Amino acid sequence: MAPIALLSVSNKHGIVSLAESLHRMHGFQLLSSGGTAKVLEDAGLPVTRVAEHTGAAEILGGRVKTLHPRVHGGILAMRGDPDHEVDLEQHQIPPIDVVVVNLYPFRETVANPQVSWETAIENIDIGGPAMVRAAAKNHAHVAVLTRPDQYDRFLVALSDGVDGQLRRELALEAFEHTAAYDVAISHWMGVRLSEQASQWLEAIPLRQRLRYGENPHQQAAWYSAPKQGWGGAIQLQGKELSTNNLLDLEAALATVREFGYGTDGAHQAVQDAAVVVKHTNPCGVAIGTGVASALSRALDADRVSAFGGIVALNGLVDATTARELTSLFLECVVAPGFEPEAREILASKANLRLLELAPGAVDAAGRDHIRTILGGVLVQDQDDQLIDPTSWTVASKRAPTAEENDDLTFAWRLVRHVRSNAIVVARAGQSLGVGAGQMNRVGSARLALEAAGDQARGAVLASDGFFPFDDTVRLAANHGIRAVIQPGGSKRDADSIAVCDEFGLAMVLTGKRHFLH
C-alpha cells in the first residue's frame, strides 16, 4: 500500500512543490480537502478528497470535514500494535504517514481592531488542531509539518529515512503551534470580555538566542512577535544585538515617540527629535528644525554620557545626520528610515548597529507592559497616555510665560522616561541635566542641576513625583530655575508653592504621577 500524506493548509506557500515531491519522488498518495485540494488539483496532482476517503460529505458549511474515524484512526494508529492493526483492518482504515496542516489565520484576523466577534469566531480552526495534535502524539509513526519552512528539511530527511529525533522535533513544533493558537484565541477573548482576564497568556516565538544577558554569566534569548514592535525591525548593519542593546533601544524609542514617529502621512513626526540613552535612562534629548539639528543638540546635552550610547531618531536619517552620528562612538541607532547616502556614510562604522523600524510595526505592538517577579508576572498598561497641558493648573502666584510653558511641556514629556526618583532640567527644547534613580528626590535634583551647571539659570525643572518637602524647590531656585512642573498631591505642597512665590518661580501641577521602576 502506498504511504498517505494528508495535506490541509491555510498558508499554501510551498504546498504544491511539497506535494509534488511527496507524490512523484516518494510515491505518496495525496489526501486533501477544501481549498488545499483545489490548489493541488489545479497543479495537475492526483488528489483523493477527504469526503471520498471517509464516505462522509463535508457538512455545516465546511465546519466538519476531517473529524472522522477514518482520518483520526489513520493518524493515531500505532504501527506494530496488534490491537491497533486489528482495528484498522476491521474498519478498513489505511494508516496516514504524514500530516501537513496549518491553521486558520486567527491571529492575523484579530489584528484588525475593527474585526467583528462573528468573523473572529469563524476563524477558529477545529479540525486542524485536532489533526496536528493527533499526529504529534503519534510522532513515533507519523511526521507532522505545521510550517512551510519545515518542508525542505523534511524532504531531505525523507530520502534517507526520517529518524526519531526529527519526528520528536516536529512534534514539539506542532504542539507549540497549537498552544500558541489557543493562547491567541483565549487572549483575544479575554481582552474583549474583560479588562483583566482571569489568566494572562501570550505565546511569543523565539527570534534569536543572545550571546548573554545583562552580564556575561547570564544566558539570554529574545522572543518577539513577527512584524510587531521590535519583531518588525530590520538590522541593516553592525554586530549582533545584545540584551542591553535591546533594553536601551526600547527606552530610547519610547522617549522619542513622545514627539511622534515616522516620515509621512499618518505617522508624520510632530517635532523632529533625537534621544540618546545610557543604561535605559535618557542622557540627552532635544528637538530641532530637522533630525540632524535635533541630534546635534541631543549629543551636546551631555557628550560625556553619550559616548557608547544608543540613539533613537523619529524621522528619516539623511547624510547630514549620518555624519553627526559618526562623530563619536555609538552602539545602536534606530530610526524609521535611512537615505541611501546616509547608509553609505554609516557603513564606515561597521560595528554600529543600525535598525530600521517602521511606524506600522510600532503601532502593531500591544500596550501591555510586562515584568516578571518570583513565580509570576505583573501586567499593566503602558504609561503612554497623551500629555494634555490644558488639564494642568498653576499653583504659584506667577504663571509661566509662553516660552516657559513650552519648556515645561518638553520636560514633562521627558521625565516620565527617567528612572525614579526622576528630575529633568531643560530649556528651549533641550535637556540640560537628568537626575535618575536616586533614593531621595533632592538627590536626583542635585545631579540634574550639577549636570546643567550655569545653563540651569532661566531653565525649567520637572519632577516625576510630588515634593515631600520644600528642599528640592529651594535648591532649584538657588540654581536659577524659573519654573517647575510636578504632579502635586503632597501634604506639604503649600511649602513648595511658598518657596516658588518667595523666589518668583512659576509652579505647574499636572495631577498625574509618572514613576518608572
Swiss-Prot record:
Q: Which Gene3D superfamilies match?
A: 3.40.140.20, Methylglyoxal synthase-like domain
Q: Which UniProt keywords apply?
A: Hydrolase, Multifunctional enzyme, Purine biosynthesis, Transferase
Q: Which pathway does it operate in?
A: Purine metabolism; IMP biosynthesis via de novo pathway; 5-formamido-1-(5-phospho-D-ribosyl)imidazole-4-carboxamide from 5-amino-1-(5-phospho-D-ribosyl)imidazole-4-carboxamide (10-formyl THF route): step 1/1; Purine metabolism; IMP biosynthesis via de novo pathway; IMP from 5-formamido-1-(5-phospho-D-ribosyl)imidazole-4-carboxamide: step 1/1
EC id: 2.1.2.3, 3.5.4.10
Q: Does the keyword Ribonucleoprotein apply?
A: no
Matches recorded under PANTHER family: BIFUNCTIONAL PURINE BIOSYNTHESIS PROTEIN ATIC (PTHR11692:SF0), BIFUNCTIONAL PURINE BIOSYNTHESIS PROTEIN PURH (PTHR11692)
Q: What domain comment accompanies this record?
A: The IMP cyclohydrolase activity resides in the N-terminal region.
Protein name according to UniProt: Bifunctional purine biosynthesis protein PurH
| Protein's organism | Prochlorococcus marinus (strain MIT 9303)
The gene from which this protein is expressed is purH
